[in-house]
């Protein structure tokens, strides 16, 4: 057998030389893996273990602070009904605000996740500070002007002015949604990359995600106990929306600025190097799909990378010892940056071409949308439980109470699922993307897949929705805790387990981008189910008005007909989602058939 022809030097390559020969393919793979002296310099200059541990702990504290404050949008139900009462918004208009915020919270996630993976979580935290300050500042100003005008009977100075004011309020909640997305993503990505490669990856992700759920609880309690209206006779009124918005704007701006400096990825070069080694051990780097898909001229690579072996050699990657006019440190930084981009873009393309990801993402969409709609409309749902023509003993239950119940159950279940999956779920030998079977697993007396946990809590979520839809809670507001507790537990577990499963199957190097793509889907679900609920609710309002029961309260609906059909449909949506996730796991060419440990 003839010996292989050695790869030509750059000065020997003519226009007719093929850009991707077998030798250059293996050369590319080995060069991307090692980057020769550049990689050695990175390893020699790496942070000491003690300093790295301190940096990780500081970043974790900063991520925890960001997560504890970022979930302000989850308490929308505390003031949604006030918009109806003071600003005379219809249920459709109130849901328009919550849907705009939900849409803005989820839709930019792929772009912001891509930015987080490429430039780091710090700049993303600063982006969140700017959006939160602008959003809550604008919302406070619009609310103050409209509420004062309505109190004086000016009707917001005319219909056109009212439309402009509503458009400004929509813009404010879009800003708040983008700020929420940015702060949450920067915090979770920091924890995923700093701690997500160890055996406690579930807890490392569950803690900031749980803290995000907890943020709604403490903010709702602070609002109801501190930021309330005080009347001249000393009695306590409803939430003081204007001052509460000002407080949230200032708080979140400060927290976002602190995260700009506190959120860091420690030893990221090692993370990328290990990812490349894992890809090569799996044989993925030697496959034509990976290299040719990225480097051939007729099939450009995913994203901004479109490099041939000649381009890579010219850039100093295939031959890092090649002299260059730039300093060694600049060459080293360039090589590290190109290698990082190469790996991240490759993993993004692999993620997008995995059919099980789309089943999983669609299932997440059908689970989270109903949960979001329930949480956003807590305030108006609770009001339907207390028809004004009936006398009730004691104080009616409040939206703040059930926002706190959702927050507490969500937080506890997120921590519980993170801990239990670390203890009971099987662990792959690979710490990065699982491309083929992980081989022999560590023997355990008992193991339970993370997907089993996900399906169990999804069913729990659907039971909470069905309980409300059944009418069992109508005229019995004291029972509402059953629905809010079950929905909070299911919603929290699904939101915690989904990113954990993503890190286990597709690795942590490209986590922000991968999670961002999946997290985009609930925006459509929350918007859709919010509109369904609004349509059912508004139908009840119009029916009551036609029967002569509207009067001064003509924007409100009372009775199970205001919500029952909407929440039955939401429960069915969650059941369909369970089927999709089960198919991705156990179906044809699913994770189980491919030997992927999850």
Swiss-Prot record:
It is found in: Vacuole membrane. InterPro entries: MFS, MFS_trans_sf. The chain crosses the membrane at residues 63-83, 96-116, 122-142, 164-184, 202-222, 241-261, 355-375, 405-425, 453-473, 486-506, 516-536, 565-585. GO terms for molecular function: transmembrane transporter activity. Keywords: Glycoprotein, Membrane, Transmembrane, Transmembrane helix, Transport, Vacuole. Coiled coil: none annotated. Signal peptide: none annotated. SUPFAM superfamilies: MFS general substrate transporter. Residues 1-49, 315-334 are annotated as: Disordered. GO terms for cellular component: fungal-type vacuole membrane. Glycans are attached at residues 57, 325. It is a multi-pass membrane protein. Residues 22-37 have a biased composition (Low complexity). The keyword Lipid metabolism does not apply. Belongs to the major facilitator superfamily. Probable transporter. This is Probable transporter mch1. It comes from Neurospora crassa (strain ATCC 24698 / 74-OR23-1A / CBS 708.71 / DSM 1257 / FGSC 987). The gene is mch1.
């Amino acid at each position: 057998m003839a010996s292989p022809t050695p790869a030509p030097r750059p000065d020997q390559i003519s226009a007719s030389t093929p850009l991707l020969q077998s030798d250059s393919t293996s050369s590319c793979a080995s060069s991307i893996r090692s980057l020769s002296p550049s990689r050695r310099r990175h390893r020699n200059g790496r942070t000491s273990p003690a300093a790295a541990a301190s940096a990780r702990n500081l970043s974790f504290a900063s991520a925890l602070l960001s997560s504890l404050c970022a979930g302000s949008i989850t308490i929308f139900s505390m003031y949604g009904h006030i918009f109806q009462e003071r600003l005379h918004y219809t249920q459709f208009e109130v849901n328009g605000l919550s849907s705009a915020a939900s849409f803005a919270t989820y839709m930019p996630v792929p772009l912001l996740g891509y930015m987080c993976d490429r430039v780091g979580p710090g700049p993303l935290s600063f982006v969140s500070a700017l959006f939160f300050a602008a959003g809550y500042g604008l919302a406070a100003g619009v609310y103050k002007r409209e509420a004062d005008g309505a109190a004086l009977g000016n009707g917001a100075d005319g219909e056109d002015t009212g439309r402009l004011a509503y458009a400004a309020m929509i813009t404010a909640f879009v800003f708040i949604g983008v700020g929420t997305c940015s702060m949450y993503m920067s915090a979770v990505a920091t924890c995923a990359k700093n701690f997500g490669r160890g055996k406690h990856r579930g807890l490392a992700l569950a803690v900031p995600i749980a803290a995000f759920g907890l943020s709604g609880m403490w903010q709702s309690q602070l609002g109801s106990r501190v930021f309330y209206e005080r009347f001249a006779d000393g009695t306590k009124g409803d939430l003081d929306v204007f001052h509460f918005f000002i407080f949230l704007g200032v708080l979140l701006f400060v927290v976002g600025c602190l995260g700009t400096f506190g959120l860091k990825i420690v030893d990221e070069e090692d993370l990328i190097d290990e990812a490349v080694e894992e890809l090569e051990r799996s044989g993925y780097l030697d496959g034509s799909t990976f290299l040719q898909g990225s480097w051939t001229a007729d099939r450009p690579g995913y994203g901004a990378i479109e490099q041939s072996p000649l381009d890579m050699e010219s850039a100093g990657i295939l031959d890092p010892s090649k002299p260059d006019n730039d300093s060694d440190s600049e060459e080293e930084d360039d090589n590290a940056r190109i290698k990082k981009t190469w790996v991240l873009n490759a993993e993004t393309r692999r993620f997008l071409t995995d059919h099980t990801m789309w089943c999983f993402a669609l299932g997440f969409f059908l689970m989270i949308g109903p949960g979001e709609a329930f949480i956003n409309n807590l305030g108006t749902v609770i009001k339907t439980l207390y028809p004004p023509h009936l006398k009730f003993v004691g104080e009616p239950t409040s939206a703040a109470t059930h926002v706190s119940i959702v927050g507490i159950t969500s937080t506890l279940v997120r921590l519980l699922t993170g801990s239990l999956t670390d203890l009971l779920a099987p662990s792959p030998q690979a710490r990065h993307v699982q491309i083929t079977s992980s081989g022999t697993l560590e023997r355990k007396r008992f193991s339970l897949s993370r997907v089993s946990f996900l399906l169990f809590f999804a069913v729990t979520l659907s039971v909470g929705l069905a309980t409300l839809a059944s009418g069992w809670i109508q005229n019995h507001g004291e029972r509402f805790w059953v629905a809010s507790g079950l929905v909070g537990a299911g919603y929290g577990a699904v939101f915690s387990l989904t990113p954990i499963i993503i890190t286990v199957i597709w690795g942590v190097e490209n986590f922000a981008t991968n999670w961002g793509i999946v997290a985009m889907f609930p925006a459509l679900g929350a918007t859709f189910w919010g509109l369904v609920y609004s349509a059912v609710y508004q139908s009840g309002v119009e029916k009551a008005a036609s029967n002569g029961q509207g009067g001064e309260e003509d924007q409100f609906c009372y009775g199970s007909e205001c919500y029952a059909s909407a929440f039955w449909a939401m429960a069915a949506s969650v059941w369909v989602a369970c089927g999709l996730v089960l198919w991705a796991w156990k179906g044809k060419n699913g994770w189980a058939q491919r030997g992927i440990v999850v």
